[in-house]
């Protein structure tokens, strides 16, 4: 693929918003009823926790800010996304990882390529991560097979799967960018099921009992040639994943999939904060 063709294809991918067929544009830009979700998974040797928050981008009309904090044992990550509200298309992304080493990676999604910047701590231990010395910059090419697919982040799949579930569409595909790799995620419908829940709803108390859930399946495959080891994760899960949404409230109640070193796993909603009415 020559440079001009690649530019046109990638520009098309950024501008064609990959909208689902049923919801209107106004519905696609409405924030979901929740503002924060917190999940937890307990294993014999560790407890994994994740917190997701979604708000409108105050200085960027038509865009959302998604923040995610996940931790297990001594490792943690802090992810910030700026997304197009209509599609979930990435505008910018950052990931601060802490563990044996610390590093901050930021990504700017341009029509021709992704600008990737990597920072690491300097001599000042109190320096903010955004001010850490720049270690490297890299232009990451979009894969030839991206086409007009929406390019998003794994955490944003929680939003897109909920939106997909509210349509009459039977299947949908998006692309996910990790660091150097790209993945195709195919969304489809599973059989509705009943699920036992036990979570805290801020300001309203404990919610427990049996809920009817809509099942959305995610099938993850490599998109283009792998440039690094496999690194797709969604709240610690990889491979094929199922998301279970409360049919009545729309809240994501549980994720089911495979976790490294653990095997088959279920990650359940532990608390939720609903958005204030405006």
For each predicted feature, which ranges?
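Sec/Tat signal peptide C-region and signal peptidase I cleavage site
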Residues: 22-26
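Bacterial N-terminal signal peptides
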Residues: 9-19
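Bacterial N-terminal signal peptides that target proteins for export
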Residues: 1-11
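Hydrophobic alpha-helical segments and helix pairs
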Residues: 89-145
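Selective for proline/serine-rich intrinsically disordered segments
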Residues: 20-21, 31, 56, 131, ...
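Extracytoplasmic beta-rich ectodomain segments of secreted or membrane-anchored proteins
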Residues: 137-182
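Acidic, serine/threonine-rich low-complexity disordered tracts
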Residues: 27-113, 166-278
